[in-house]
A protein has these predicted regions:
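An alpha-helical support segment within catalytic cores of ATP-dependent transferases
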Residues: 1, 113, 118-125, 132-133, ...
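Short secondary-structure junctions
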Residues: 1-6, 54-58
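ATP-binding glycine-rich phosphate-binding loop
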Residues: 3-24
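Glycine-rich loop motifs involved in handling phospho/adenylate chemistry
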Residues: 8-12, 126-129, 182
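Residue-level signal for WD-repeat beta-propeller blades
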Residues: 14, 66-67, 193
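Amphipathic coiled-coil/heptad-repeat helices and related helical stalk/stem segments
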Residues: 16, 46, 162-165
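Active-site acidic catalytic loop and adjacent metal/ATP-binding pocket
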Residues: 18-23, 32, 108-109, 166-193
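ATP-binding pocket architecture of kinase catalytic cores
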Residues: 21-136, 150, 174
């Protein structure tokens, strides 16, 4: 009887409290998503959203295994070919990549279902995406980026101006709150499909 040895290698994650590891063995690769902070959001809801996308015929990583007590889930591995990497390759068909991404976003926004069972069997209801939530999301730029790259002297003035502009833009949007919002839809998370 031969045992299957697996190798875990940390891979670049996103701006969350999740850590990602590629699990390699001689059978297949998978991704381990590990989170000790905000476990509900970073494991349960993450897997539920993927399940909702799959149910609506949108390619998303399937859940292979979960161990909530040990702070991880194991999901399908789509490889390393992100749209970001492909856009930066010489000779890539950038127009086609953008068109496919926009078509995918349009398909996602047509999802009307707002409830899905998580892997613990409980219903998860998508939150309403209102003006306040949009403001908080837009402010992430200040929370994650400006304080890292702008001097403290300029930071407060810049953040006040950015907040003012965000509020102005939101006040002119006229949100209907009936669209699925995929909060991680960006070129570093979109894979070649």
């Amino acid at each position: 009887m031969s045992s299957v040895k697996s190798i875990l290698k940390k891979i670049k994650g996103d701006a969350s409290f999740r850590s990602f590891y590629r699990k390699k063995n001689n059978k297949e690769n998978s991704i381990i998503v590990y989170a000790t902070k905000e476990k509900e959001k970073n494991l349960l809801i993450y897997a539920a959203i993927n399940s909702l996308l799959i149910k609506n015929k949108i390619l998303a990583p399937k859940l292979y295994k979960e161990n909530y007590k040990q702070n991880f889930i194991e999901i399908e591995d789509f490889g390393d070919d992100t749209i970001f990497k492909l856009l930066n390759k010489n000779g890539s068909n950038k127009i086609n990549l953008y068109k496919r991404s926009i078509n995918l976003l349009s398909k996602i926004q047509k999802i009307k279902q707002n409830k899905i069972k998580n892997f613990k069997g409980k219903n998860y209801k998508l939150p309403v995406y209102d003006d306040y939530k949009l403001f908080k999301e837009a402010k992430l730029f200040c929370d994650w980026y400006t304080k890292k790259y702008i001097s403290k002297k300029k930071l407060q003035t810049l953040n006040i101006e950015i907040n003012k502009q965000i509020k102005f833009l939101i006040s002119n949007l006229n949100l209907k709150n009936d669209t699925f919002v995929h909060r991680d839809f960006h070129v570093s998370n979109l894979m070649k499909y």
